[in-house]
């Protein structure tokens, strides 16, 4: 929020895959909608732009990025969210410097704010060397949540998953929290398949969502222990030997 309140500055969220960079922006949108932000940010709306839609040029040769900015200049109080923003570095016709400079007028007026997101590796590889970009976009490091924070995130996300799927995890909050803790422990750092590269909370949330998928496949409005067990058995994010051990523990606990 402090970066967005700073004139001529926008933010770029930097963190490992799966740490919740997009969720931060969703949380900001929720707070803006509820008016739980400083007065200067009230009335802003967030537009989520797909990076792929901004790459390249139009048939007439005009840069898609430039075209987007020209359209946004007609609007007021816009926060543009661009995931994988590193893909736009060097995507304009002349050089990578152009991308940051294209935003100069909008950022200067304060009517356009940008939140970018990228991984730590892509930031160091593409963005760090772009001085024009780093002048206008302040790096915000997004660390991986702790075990306890991830359990809390999962408990907070559960109602949203239930609303989206129409299925319910019908247990007491005590049992629900035990289930979340189990899924979080199952997906801790040294149990993850290295090539997957995902982190808390996404890797744990993926397991939970898979359990809901199995319930929907069964045409069930309730997610039960067997659906969770099935999600664990078929997980592609955790080493097979870890899954075998945890399934035994799962049977004992639940």
Which residues does each predicted region cover?
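AAA+ P-loop NTPase nucleotide-binding core of proteostasis motors
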Residues: 1-254
């Amino acid at each position: 929020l402090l970066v967005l309140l700073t004139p001529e500055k926008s933010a770029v969220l930097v963190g490992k895959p799966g740490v919740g960079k997009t969720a931060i922006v969703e949380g900001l949108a929720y707070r803006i909608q509820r008016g739980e932000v400083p007065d200067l940010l009230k009335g802003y709306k967030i537009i989520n732009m797909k990076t792929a839609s901004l790459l390249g040029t139009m048939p007439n040769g005009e840069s898609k990025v430039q075209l987007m900015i020209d359209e946004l200049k007609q609007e007021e109080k816009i926060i543009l969210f661009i995931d994988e923003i590193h893909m736009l570095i060097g995507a304009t016709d002349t050089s990578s410097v152009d991308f940051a400079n294209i935003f100069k007028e909008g950022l200067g007026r304060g009517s356009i704010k940008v939140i970018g997101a990228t991984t730590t590796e892509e930031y160091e590889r593409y963005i760090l060397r772009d001085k024009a970009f780093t002048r206008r976009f302040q790096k915000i490091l997004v660390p991986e949540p702790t075990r306890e924070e991830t359990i809390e995130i999962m408990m907070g996300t559960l109602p949203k998953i239930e609303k989206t799927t129409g299925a319910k995890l019908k247990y007491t909050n005590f049992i629900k929290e035990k289930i979340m803790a189990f899924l979080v422990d199952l997906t801790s750092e040294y149990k993850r398949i290295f090539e997957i590269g995902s982190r808390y909370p996404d890797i744990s949330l993926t397991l939970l969502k898979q359990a809901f998928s199995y319930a929907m496949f069964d045409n069930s409005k309730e997610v039960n222990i067997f659906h969770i067990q099935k999600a664990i058995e078929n997980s592609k994010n955790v080493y097979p030997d870890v899954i075998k051990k945890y399934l035994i523990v799962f049977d004992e606990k639940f």
